């Protein structure tokens, strides 16, 4: 979360009030609006943040959500603002209300890990670009290497092919040798590409968890 395009589309289709009503949690429009209104009146950042999370989770009602990820557009924006407390609020809320683990997607893994560690968020799930040539790895390749070796967290590697800049065999062989990586996320244009990538992962990472494509 969040899926930003749905908010823009809802505003176009239903107007501002209609969009708000569609995305408020099921405890009731008035209760949720009052909670949000009181939060704004009191400048209660925690109340506002939890309301936004609950609104986003409404579409998943009745489904198991073992991990709830905060998208990098939000994570990196909060990092840039220095609003680190938002990560603690998010983590505590998804654990307490949804019995889920918080996940964080970022383009600056080293900086995020330092912040999460300072907040006391232990062994976090972090999805980030991790590849052999440092493609879109903000903070620098060496900082990522140190973090993977020294930090206690569960890494999900994405952009492992660096948008096609690294041959598949070379990319998978390298990422499978890195410490602390628990999963690999990749995109594929067809079944054959998925199968060949899966075979490479099985070859270089025989004890790997399930592959996500």
Task: Describe these PLM feature segments.
Residues 51, 62, 66, 74-213:
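Beta/alpha (TIM)-barrel catalytic core signal, keyed to glycine-rich beta->alpha loops juxtaposed to Asp/Glu
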Residues 1-81:
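Active-site beta->alpha loop and helix N-cap motifs at the rims of alpha/beta catalytic domains
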């Amino acid at each position: 979360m969040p899926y930003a395009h749905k908010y823009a589309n809802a505003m176009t289709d239903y107007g501002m009030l209609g969009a708000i009503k569609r995305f408020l949690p099921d405890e009731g429009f008035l209760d949720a609006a009052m909670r949000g209104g009181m939060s704004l009146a009191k400048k209660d950042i925690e109340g506002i943040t939890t309301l936004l999370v609950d609104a986003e989770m409404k579409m998943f009602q009745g489904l198991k959500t073992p991990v709830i990820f905060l998208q990098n557009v939000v994570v990196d924006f909060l990092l840039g603002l220095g609003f680190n407390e938002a990560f603690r609020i998010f983590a505590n809320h998804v654990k307490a209300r949804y019995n889920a683990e918080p996940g964080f997607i970022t383009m600056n893994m080293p900086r995020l890990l330092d912040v999460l560690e300072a907040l006391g968020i232990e062994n976090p799930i972090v999805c980030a670009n991790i590849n052999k040539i440092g493609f879109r790895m903000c903070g620098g390749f060496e900082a990522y290497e140190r973090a993977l070796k020294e930090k206690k967290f569960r890494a999900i590697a994405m952009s492992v092919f660096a948008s096609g800049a690294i041959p598949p065999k070379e990319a998978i062989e390298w990422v499978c040798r890195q410490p602390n990586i628990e999963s690999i996320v990749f995109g594929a244009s067809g079944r054959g590409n998925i199968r060949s990538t899966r075979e490479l992962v099985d070859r270089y990472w025989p004890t790997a968890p399930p592959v996500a494509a």
